[in-house]
Amino acid sequence: MKDVSKNQEENISDTALTNELIHLLGHSRHDWMNKLQLIKGNLSLQKYDRVFEMIEEMVIDAKHESKLSNLKTPHLAFDFLTFNWKTHYMTLEYEVLGEIKDLSAYDQKLAKLMRKLFHLFDQAVSRESENHLTVSLQTDHPDRQLILYLDFHGAFADPSAFDDIRQNGYEDVDIMRFEITSHECLIEIGLD
């Protein structure tokens, strides 16, 4: 009887995973269709320079997505790749600066840190403005395994959401820089 129950659990788990994968592929397909529609629209308007710019942006985004996916940080990569598909009060852009390296030892820590920061940004930003966060992951720093740069542009409704992390830090990461104004925020975090 245990074997039957275990097989049922595995089938349910496989089905749930398959459904989630199909759901994620649907989001990805939707993103690509939007980009293709923009290219098609610009072609019909004979804005060829803009078409070439868009294609170049798509290539750059795909390269960063590939580098992120190859850092061996599946939880972090999942959060970044799916961020803009979820309800947030800002858009996310990311880039990997430097060579691909194995950061698997940092995956859980990075995912937890970024989820915390995303939550704080969602609490702090104005819901009436266009908000944009760029996260750069520098893998080739001479003194650190990784440096995260967060560069926010938009508007804050409640910047005090960051007070605790600014004053007390966060677990065992080194917050090297934290500057905030009513419309910008720069954060630099080092991991050894």
Curated annotation (Swiss-Prot):
GO CC terms: cytoplasm
Subcellular location: Cytoplasm
SMART domains per the UniProt record, alphabetical: SPOB_ab (SM01317)
Entry annotated with the keyword Transferase: yes
Gene3D superfamilies: 1.10.287.130, Sporulation initiation phosphotransferase B (SpoOB), C-terminal domain (3.30.565.30)
GO MF, one example: phosphorelay sensor kinase activity
Enzyme nomenclature, EC number: 2.7.-.-
Entry keyword set: Cytoplasm, Kinase, Phosphoprotein, Sensory transduction, Sporulation, Transferase
Known function: Key element in the phosphorelay regulating sporulation initiation. Acts on spo0A. Mediates reversible phosphoryl transfer from spo0F to spo0A.
Binding partners and assembly: Homodimer. Dimerization is essential for activity as both monomers contribute to the formation of the active site.
UniProt name for this protein: Sporulation initiation phosphotransferase B
Organism: Bacillus subtilis (strain 168)
